[in-house]
Each structure stands twice: as C-alpha cells, then as structure tokens.
C-alpha cells in the first residue's frame, strides 16, 4: 500500500511538472502571437484617413479618436452631382467626447485644488 501511495505521489509530481512546462510553452506562444498582432495593428493604424478628409476610396479607413472611431459620411453638396465622402464623428459621439474632455479638465482642477 505504501508503494502504491509513493508511486502515485511520484506520478502526480511528474504530471504537474510536465503540465507546467507545457503551459509555459503555450504562454510564450500567446505572447509571440500578441506581439505580432500589435505590430499589425500599428501598421494598419498608419493608413487611416484623418477627420474631414476624403474617405471615398475606403469607407472603413477613418481614424480613431481617444474614445470613438470616426465614420465615413457621404453627402451631395448643394451645387454638384458628385457624392462627397468625409470622415466625421457622429453627432452624439462628438457631444460625448466634448463632455468627457470637460470632465477631465474639471477633474484636473479638483486635483489641483485638493491635491
């Protein structure tokens, strides 16, 4: 009985060691994959269309602001038959960004007063 118990503890120790080695390998693979995704994201971010610039070539290329992504909005000017598309913030999100900026400024003032 002691032999079975000792053998079981030995197998359990061996199994936990081998599984921890496998988990370390998986963690390293996840980190490498995450780094490659971040590099791709940085490369993609350089090609975005700034706010109020023409986005008719790619309607999904508008840049991201601090909080939200701009949307490609198309319209017809008063004197013209050609459709014009520009990257613009949606009205409700623009108001939310302004409110967030004011809240940050107010928070900075409070921190300055009490901090």
UniProtKB/Swiss-Prot annotation:
Residues 21-44 form a propeptide. GO terms for molecular function: toxin activity. Disulfide bonds join 48-63, 55-72, 62-87, 74-85. It comes from Lycosa singoriensis. Residues 1-20 form the signal peptide. Keywords: Disulfide bond, Knottin, Secreted, Signal, Toxin. This is U3-lycotoxin-Ls1s. Expressed by the venom gland. The presence of a 'disulfide through disulfide knot' structurally defines this protein as a knottin. InterPro entries: Spider_toxin_CSTX_Knottin_CS (IPR011142). GO terms for cellular component: extracellular region.
